[in-house]
A protein has these predicted regions:
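Bacterial N-terminal signal peptides that target proteins for export
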Residues: 1-9
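Cleavable N-terminal signal peptides
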Residues: 11-12, 22
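Short boundary/loop segments of OB/S1/cold-shock single-stranded nucleic-acid-binding domains
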Residues: 23-37
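OB-fold/S1-family single-stranded nucleic acid-binding modules
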Residues: 102-130
Length: 131
């Protein structure tokens, strides 16, 4: 019995040591999780990569200037299970993106929430639940 306890305790302790850094990676502290922001613009690039797919969007600002936004979604593995691939969004696509904006005021959104989505200009959801 003693021979089995020590290895199990060692494994358990090791898991405790890595649990903090793993949860920190998925922390939401950089984003305003209380409010949703809607962004309408033109896709300039879609990176279907891990750990998070990225959508680059040019948005016309209130003052007529172009704002370069980045929307971070789930992993490409997760999106693939939802039927999406690297060709789901293309440069020039007009999109409406809903997500949690970066707290520091940067043009960034976090899309890993069920109520977040990416829709075309007619509000047809292109990418939704899997964000």
């Amino acid at each position: 019995m003693k021979n089995k306890v020590l290895p199990l305790l060692s494994v358990g302790f090791g898991l405790l040591l890595v649990s903090g850094p793993l949860s920190a990676h998925h922390g939401k502290g950089a984003f305003d999780m209380e409010n949703l922001t809607i962004v309408k613009g033109t896709v300039t690039k879609f990176e279907f990569i891990n750990p998070h797919a990225l959508i680059y969007i040019d948005v016309m600002g209130d003052k007529g200037n172009v704002e370069h936004w980045i929307a971070e979604s789930s992993s490409n593995n997760h999106l693939s299970r939802g039927g999406y691939d690297k060709n789901s969004l293309k440069p020039g696509d007009q999109v409406i993106v809903t997500g949690h904006r970066a707290k520091n005021g940067a043009y960034g959104l976090e899309l890993q929430c069920k109520e977040c989505s990416v829709a075309d200009s007619q509000n047809k959801v292109l990418l939704g639940y899997y964000f």
